[in-house]
Regions:
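N-terminal secretory/targeting leader peptides
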Residues: 24-133, 148-370
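C-terminal motif of bacterial Sec signal peptides marking the signal peptidase cleavage site
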Residues: 18-22
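Bacterial N-terminal signal peptides that target proteins for export
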Residues: 1-11
Length: 370
């Protein structure tokens, strides 16, 4: 019944999306202003974990805020604050929880010290791809679990974007075996960082705004961030030359929209539906943007900045997969919420993998002539 109610609201709001966003331009803005003048105007603050105007992630938050305003006819306006403007990047969750901001935009693995199970809702090493993750969230019980673990913090989560499969990271030396990870200080948050710890590396959790300086000054020896589109914008090629793939640690990283529970529930039903549709549209649009932008950015990195593109050895990936499986089992055993989420995640992963082995993987191999 809950799903039917949500779907009916989404359908109504989707019609508003088409009529309002399709207009665009100054005429659309005038309509928004007129509607706002005739209705109560609600003003929200959105805190983010991203640098100001950062491509894909930061701009994704800004676009989401603009669409909420347009779709609501100016009744709900959201002002976006980049990391550090209102609160530090890694304090965005707390700001939304206590009501300092009504909305947040970040990644759930940043709050692992507060909510260990939250890490599963950004990404899991060797886990679900972006599309598989969305399917688990909307049709496999993932969203309900996500909402449940945030209840004690008065926060409502929603998936608000995904850059897709990431790169394996930037290094100043070749990585040929597990021995090369020994003592390596690498920026890698979430479960991937715990896997690194198991193989002898030193994981460091840094927000995006601090990565370049840390890598350039030697505070860290290596880093992963997102992929070519974002990594080029950050200038990471100036601090390291070896660029490894695949991104075993982040096969699809969900970006998270956070809502203060009291603020969200105070909205009328139609505004709640508008917000949900806007977030769901942002979730898909980010993947579209990154998929369209990554390859040209990668060519720029390799051809213009002499970045050395390297593939992790197969035996190294197998060892990391083994360490990842052990890490996930240990995490689940230590925390009841993590156990519940992991069980659901693993069940869905096993099921969808069976299908993708004969569909996605088989097709990609055929397309490549293999």
């Amino acid at each position: 019944m809950r799903n039917l109610m949500v779907l009916s609201k989404l359908a109504l709001a989707a019609l508003l999306t088409v009529s309002l966003i399709a207009c665009g331009g100054s005429e659309s803005d005038k309509k928004v202003a007129t509607a706002a003048a005739n209705a109560e105007v609600i003003n929200w603050k959105m805190v983010t974990t991203w640098p100001k105007n950062y491509p894909g992630l930061g701009t994704g938050a800004q676009t989401l805020a603009k669409n909420i305003s347009k779709m609501s006819g100016g009744r709900l306006n959201v002002k976006v604050y980049a990391a550090g403007e209102l609160v530090p990047a890694l304090e965005a969750f707390d700001a939304v929880s206590r009501g300092t901001a009504e909305m947040g935009h970040g990644a759930s693995y940043y709050w692992k010290g507060k909510v260990p199970a939250a890490q599963f809702f950004t990404t899991v090493p060797f886990g679900l791809t972006s599309q598989e993750f969305n399917s688990w969230i909307y049709y496999g019980g993932g969203l309900q679990l996500w909402e449940e673990i945030y209840v004690p913090f008065n926060v409502i989560p929603m998936p608000a974007g995904n850059p897709g499969v990431q790169m394996g990271g930037w290094f100043n030396k070749e990585i040929n075996s597990l021995e090369d990870f020994q003592g390596l200080k690498m920026r890698m948050p979430g479960i991937g960082g715990e896997v690194l710890k198991k193989v002898g590396a030193v994981p460091v959790n840094l927000p995006g705004s601090e990565i370049f300086t840390a890598l350039q000054t030697g505070t860290i020896d290596a880093t992963e961030w997102v992929g070519p589109y974002n990594d080029l914008a950050f200038g990471l090629y100036k601090a390291a030359k070896y660029y490894y793939y695949p991104g075993w640690q982040e096969p699809g990283s969900a970006i998270e929209a956070l809502f203060n529970k009291a603020a969200f529930e105070a909205l009328s039903e139609d505004l709640q539906a508008i917000v949900r549709v806007a977030v769901q549209q942002a979730n898909q649009d980010m993947l579209n943007e990154f998929t369209a932008s990554n390859n040209s950015a990668l060519k720029t990195l390799v051809n213009e900045h002499n970045v050395i593109l390297k593939e992790f050895p197969k035996d190294l990936l197998a060892a990391l997969k083994k360490a990842s499986d052990e890490t996930l089992a240990e995490m689940a055993a230590e925390d009841p919420d993590s156990q519940r989420v992991y069980d659901s995640f693993k069940t869905f992963l096993d099921s969808v993998s069976e299908w993708h082995d004969i569909s996605e993987r088989s097709y990609i191999n055929a397309r490549a002539g293999e």
